[in-house]
Each structure stands twice: as C-alpha cells, then as structure tokens.
C-alpha cells in the first residue's frame, strides 16, 4: 500500500493558486481512476485507487499547508504505511515553472508544508515530488502573495501540460519506487 499526499489549502478561495498545485495533482490522479474524495482519517479528504495491483491512498490535508503533517501521520498510522511508501506532492518556488523534481529525501527547502511533515515524522526521509511554480528570476517582494496568487493564463497552459506528467511520475513511484521515477521524470517538461 502506498500513500500519495497533495499539499494545499482547504478553502475555496485557494483553488487555482500556485500553492494548491499539490491538490490539483492528486485530484487529477484520482479523477483518472474515477475515484472521488471523501472524509478521510484525521483532518483530510481521501480517495482510494488500485494501480497495477497496488492499493494507493490519496489524501488532501484539510489542515492548511503549514499543519499538513497531522493529516499525513494520521493516514500513515491508520493504514500502517511506512515512510518509504509515501510521496508528498507540493509546489516549489525555487524550481522554474514547467519542471518537476522528485527526491527520495531532503530538507523542506522553504516549503512550510514539507517542513511540518518533517517535524511530524521526525525525519526528512520520505519521497517528494515538487512542481516548479517560479515564473522568472526577478526578486519577489512578497513570497506569500506570489504562492497564494492565482496562475496567469500562460502559467495555466504550463500546468495543464505538467499535471499529466506529474500523475504519471506519482504512479510510477507507486509501482517502481522513487529511484525509477526520479530517473524517468526529473527533467523539464517541453
């Protein structure tokens, strides 16, 4: 059994924001299997799918980004899932838009949802798939305004291209593991 977690914020005002791309990614995965989200363990919504014989639990924490670890730990405890079998999908301000980056472990890199998950698990050793949201290299006056802002029309086009690839990468992880997914998907989307 695997656990895929998409990070975002629960209120409707956050739909379509850069910070909620993790929610968009897991919604795409669930929809491709005809699965719907319902009340999950802890403060989350969850969907269940089976991919090539592997049961996969997909969750969207409803705790706000900065407290995502609570929902992750609740799902891991209930389903008895170990850290090696979880994948966290989130936005990354440090990656250019149109890029995904999978890692087997690592720091939060300034992503507060990842930071709380690391604190809650007491470890940086879990897989994550970061979706680049950085549009250009100009300095931002407010990081929070940018990540909580809606995608521009051009950015939406890029995200529409990247979400199916993100879905494929996450599903590759569930069957073949993080190393295989990293080798196949750590490249810019064209």
Curated annotation (Swiss-Prot):
Q: Which UniProt keywords apply?
A: Cytoplasm, Hydrolase, RNA-binding, tRNA-binding
| Pfam families referenced in this protein's UniProt entry, alphabetically | Pept_tRNA_hydro
The record's principal subcellular location, in a coarse class, is cytoplasm
Quickly give the catalysed reaction: an N-acyl-L-alpha-aminoacyl-tRNA + H2O = an N-acyl-L-amino acid + a tRNA + H(+)
Binding-site list for tRNA: 14, 64, 66, 112
Q: Where is the active site?
A: 19
Quote the subcellular location field of this record.
Cytoplasm
Annotated site (Discriminates between blocked and unblocked aminoacyl-tRNA)? 9
A single cellular component GO annotation: cytoplasm
Origin: domain of life: Bacteria
Q: Does the keyword Coiled coil apply?
A: no
What GO terms in the biological process aspect are recorded for it?
protein quality control for misfolded or incompletely synthesized proteins; rescue of stalled ribosome
**Molecular-function annotations in GO:** peptidyl-tRNA hydrolase activity; tRNA binding
Its EC number(s):
3.1.1.29
Which residues does the annotation list for site: Stabilizes the basic form of H active site to accept a proton? 91
- Give the InterPro entries listed for this entry: Pept_tRNA_hydro, Pept_tRNA_hydro_CS, Pept_tRNA_hydro_sf
Query: Does Metal-binding count among this protein's keywords?
Result: no
Q: Which HAMAP family match?
A: Pept_tRNA_hydro_bact (MF_00083)
Q: How does it assemble?
A: Monomer.
- Main function: Hydrolyzes ribosome-free peptidyl-tRNAs (with 1 or more amino acids incorporated), which drop off the ribosome during protein synthesis, or as a result of ribosome stalling. Catalyzes the release of premature peptidyl moieties from peptidyl-tRNA molecules trapped in stalled 50S ribosomal subunits, and thus maintains levels of free tRNAs and 50S ribosomes.
NCBIfam families (UniProt xref):
pth
Stated family: Belongs to the PTH family.
Protein name stated in the entry: Peptidyl-tRNA hydrolase
Organism field: Pelodictyon phaeoclathratiforme (strain DSM 5477 / BU-1)
- State the organism's lineage: Bacteria, Pseudomonadati, Chlorobiota, Chlorobiia, Chlorobiales
């Amino acid at each position: 059994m695997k656990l895929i977690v998409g990070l975002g914020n629960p209120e409707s005002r956050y739909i379509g924001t850069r910070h909620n791309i993790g929610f968009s990614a897991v919604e795409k995965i669930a929809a491709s299997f005809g699965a719907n989200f319902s009340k999950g363990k802890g403060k989350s919504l969850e969907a269940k799918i089976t991919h090539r014989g592997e049961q996969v639990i997909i969750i969207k924490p409803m705790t706000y980004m900065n407290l995502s670890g609570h929902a992750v730990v609740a799902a891991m405890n209930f389903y008895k899932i170990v850290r090696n079998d979880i994948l966290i999908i989130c936005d990354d301000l440090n990656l250019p838009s149109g890029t995904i980056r999978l890692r087997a472990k690592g720091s939060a890199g300034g992503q507060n949802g990842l930071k709380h998950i690391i604190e809650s698990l007491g470890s940086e050793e879990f897989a994550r798939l970061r979706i680049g949201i950085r549009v250009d290299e100009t300095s931002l006056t407010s990081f929070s305004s940018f990540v909580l802002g809606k995608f521009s029309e051009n950015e939406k086009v890029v995200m529409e291209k990247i979400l199916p690839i993100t879905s494929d990468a996450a599903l590759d992880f569930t069957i073949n593991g993080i190393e295989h997914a990293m080798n196949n998907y750590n490249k810019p989307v064209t």
